[in-house]
Amino acid sequence: MHIPVMLNEVIKSIKIIPNGTYIDATFGCGGHSRCILSKLNEKGKLIVIDRDPKSIEFACSIKDRRLIPIHGNFSKILKYSIKYKIFGKVQGILFDLGLSFSQIKDSNRGFSFMHDGPLDMRMNNLHGISAKEWINNANIKDISFVIKEFGEEKFYKKISNVICKYRKIKNINTTKELVNLINKACGYFYKKKHPARRSFQAIRIYINNELQELKLALNDIIKIISPKGRIVFISFHSLEDRIIKKFIINNSRKKIYPYKLPILESKIKNDNIYKLKYFKKIQPSKKEILYNKKSRSAILRFAEKLKYD
C-alpha cells in the first residue's frame, strides 16, 4: 500500500489557499496530490508532472477538471508554467524526490535490490540507456566514479573490479546478479544495511540524470512562484539535500562583494533583494517511521518567496 511520506507536514508547509494554483512536480502514486486536491475549491488548480509513463497514465485516470497531468521532466517546469499560463501565479510547488511505491514494488522496473528483475532503472523506460546497457559497457573508471560520487560508497573500487571481472564471462542482466556481485565485493563489511543500497542509488541517479534535473528545476522555480508562495522539498539522501539546502540558503541571504569591486550599485541592490524566507528542516516523527519505513531517511525543507525578482 502506498503511504505518502510526511503528508501532514507537506500540507502544513505548502499552506494551501483553496482557490490557488499548485504544482506537484513528482506525482508518483499521487498520494500528496490527492490531499492537495481535497483542500482546493472549484477554482483551484493542480498541475502534476512525472516522467514515468505509468504515473501519468494513473493521473489521467483521475476525473477531476482541476487536475492537469503533464508527462515530462520537472527540469522543464518553466516551459510548462508558460504553456499553461501560470508563470508567476503558482502558490506552491512540491518536489518529493523519492522513488514511488509502484516503482519499488514492480520488479520489472529494476529499481529494487530486494526483488529480482530486469536491470533497467529508467524513470521513463521508453527512452534512454538502461542500467543493464550501461553496467555491461561502461569502463571500470566510469563505474567506479558513479558508485563513489552518486552512492558515496567507500568500497567502490572493490565493487567495480568484481563487476568488470564477471562481465568478461557473461553479461549482467538482472538485479539479482548485480546484488550478488556487490555482496561478493563488500557484503562482509555491511551488517545492518543492505550492501547494494548505495550502488543501486548511484546507478539510478546516473541513469536518470537526477541531480542535474534537480539543479535545472531550481534555476527556474523562484520565477514561477508568486509572492508568499511556498516551495517544499522532500529528499532521501545527502546529495539531493545538499543541493536543496545550498539553493535555499543562497537565495535567502545578502550577497557580499569585495571592497571597491567595480560593480554597479543597481546590481548590488538587485542581488540583495531577499528572494526566499528559509524555514527549519523537518524530519519524520518516530510514529511515522514505525508505520512507513520509507520515511526514515526523509528530510523536508521548505521556503517562502518574499517578493518578485
UniProtKB/Swiss-Prot annotation:
Positions contributing to S-adenosyl-L-methionine binding: 30-32, 50, 74, 96, 103
EC number: 2.1.1.199
Annotated S-S bridges: none
Catalytic activity: cytidine(1402) in 16S rRNA + S-adenosyl-L-methionine = N(4)-methylcytidine(1402) in 16S rRNA + S-adenosyl-L-homocysteine + H(+)
HAMAP family the record matches: 16SrRNA_methyltr_H
Keywords for this protein: Cytoplasm, Methyltransferase, rRNA processing, S-adenosyl-L-methionine, Transferase
UniProt-recorded Gene Ontology molecular function terms: rRNA (cytosine-N4-)-methyltransferase activity
One Pfam family, short name: Methyltransf_5
Role according to the record: Specifically methylates the N4 position of cytidine in position 1402 (C1402) of 16S rRNA.
Domain of life: Bacteria
Protein name: Ribosomal RNA small subunit methyltransferase H
Gene Ontology CC entries for this record: cytoplasm
Keyword flag Methyltransferase: yes
GO biological process, one term: rRNA base methylation
Compartment(s) where it occurs, according to its Swiss-Prot or TrEMBL record: Cytoplasm
SUPFAM superfamilies, per the entry: Putative methyltransferase TM0872, insert domain, S-adenosyl-L-methionine-dependent methyltransferases
Family according to the record: Belongs to the methyltransferase superfamily. RsmH family.
Gene (name only): rsmH
